[in-house]
Amino acid sequence: MRNNLPPYAVSDTNSRGRRIHEDPPIGRSQFQRDRDRVIHSTAFRRLEYKTQVFVNHEGDLFRTRLTHSLEVAQIGRSIARNLQLNEELVEAISLAHDLGHTPFGHAGQDALDNCMKAHGGFEHNLQSLRVVDVLEERYARFDGLNLCFETREGILKRATKSKAQALGELGERFLHGRSASLEAQLANLADEIAYNNHDVDDGVRSGLITQAQLEEIEIFARHLHQVKQHYPDIAGRRLVHETVRGMINTLATDLTTQSKVHIEAANPNSPDNVREMPTLVGFSDTIRQQQQELKRFLHKNLYKHYQVMRMSNKAHHIVEKLFSAFAAEPALLPPKYQHKFRDHGHQIIADYIAGMTDRYAIKEYRRMFAIIED
């Protein structure tokens, strides 16, 4: 990490620290330590077998939560460098932001949220925080990973007021309408850039959306035209890849340019000063509108495609059946979770299911409900 960060960037010296004090790391920054702890966590390894849109076994080349997190980190670090923000913090947040995601993407989250309605609901950002604060079991002195406040702040993108009240200092911004650090704001938008554009790539690869359909979307059509001008003979996968590449570059450049303008105008003098201001990291109005158009397109043509809806229906069924069985008879849980259920109730069932990979959830369903196992 550069030592000459501007005063509004988070650094080791202005960090609010860890919940449990530790001696400073040797040869690396506090946020490099956070990043390394995330990478070595069990939950991070599981992301390889948790999906974005397509169930893990549907195809080997589709993105998983792991590849998505790596892509978010790459985009975030590049923009952070141009904005003179703390790259290691952006990277740590980016790598950790999906640790609490359920199997089967958003379908799994929706199903688990429905199951948990009577018990406080389920939200993957809060679950990601729970993973790094409580569920990881690696260190002798504490549960979780004992990450810095600023990394945890970035993981927690949103929270209801009732949930925020239980989070102490971390939940204050949701109670008082404050912002997060610039690094947290950036990681959130790097996630958006990666998510939308890579779903375009996977959607075309799967055959569920076509290039012709995408040409109706302004941002895609413009970059497609530019690619064809530069490479008249390009076609197929390379054409789509170059188009998506151009879109990502445009979004990153726009985000950098607009954010610099906002930061220079606001002139914050510390991370805490940033937190008292409106959000400073953001797109131009034009790009924001084009992003929204792309989101609407993906929702209508990819996420609501009948084949994806069939996969989502299966995911709902698996999650709901597993939850109902464990809630009706906690003795069906593995012994480790049975002991915890006595003290923490249905949250432990949510922890168990949310920690499953796609493959493990399918296997557990078969073990529970198949008359004859494969």
UniProtKB/Swiss-Prot annotation:
Pfam families recorded: HD, HD_assoc
Domain HD, chain residue ranges per copy: 65-196
GO MF, one example: dGTPase activity
Record flagged with keyword Hydrolase: yes
Chain intervals for the UniProt region annotation (Disordered): 1-28
PROSITE patterns per record: HD
Example of a GO biological process term: dGTP catabolic process
Keyword Phosphoprotein: no
Stored SUPFAM superfamilies: HD-domain/PDEase-like
Keywords (A to Z) from UniProt: Hydrolase
Family to which this protein belongs: Belongs to the dGTPase family. Type 2 subfamily.
Protein name: Deoxyguanosinetriphosphate triphosphohydrolase-like protein
